[in-house]
């Protein structure tokens, strides 16, 4: 599977936003903006927003373009549909639900078969969760201290579209998130514009 190879903190600083949520991601020796003072063209700004959105979800360009194409064919608002689809990916939801401390760790957990969706093992990171889907750890995975610690001591943002049962170690997608609820800093309209002109 292809991976985004640029170091995470360096990528966050290049994009000008903390796409990984780590408190030290934007730290850098010296002063001034990492991206410098060069003024971007309209195309450059659109490209930057696209790169931000890809980085938030750790999705490679080929797969990202498939999400864009599907969103453009939908009857909803393209940018909102795009981000909703990315947000509901299993790897992202495993992170949002608190089973993992990062999307990268969440993706590894999914790939290694640690998660169940509605009681069935799912090992496809891009699997799209649907309204009412329940996510839980496999019985053997419940013995892994790190996963339990992640879940019970989760320090991330509490989201209204996720319901957590700490005692049962289960979570459920109780609503399809609106754009306003999804905690990412990106102008999805500019992302759509970037692909519309290509």
UniProtKB/Swiss-Prot annotation:
It comes from the Bacteria. GO terms for molecular function: rRNA binding; structural constituent of ribosome. GO terms for biological process: ribosomal small subunit biogenesis; translation. SUPFAM superfamilies: Alpha-L RNA-binding motif (SSF55174). InterPro entries: Ribosomal_uS4, Ribosomal_uS4_bac-type, Ribosomal_uS4_CS, Ribosomal_uS4_N, S4_RNA-bd, S4_RNA-bd_sf. The keyword Isomerase does not apply. It holds the Pfam family Ribosomal_S4. Keywords: Ribonucleoprotein, Ribosomal protein, RNA-binding, rRNA-binding. One of the primary rRNA binding proteins, it binds directly to 16S rRNA where it nucleates assembly of the body of the 30S subunit. Part of the 30S ribosomal subunit. Contacts protein S5. The interaction surface between S4 and S5 is involved in control of translational fidelity. Belongs to the universal ribosomal protein uS4 family. This is Small ribosomal subunit protein uS4C. The gene is rpsD3.
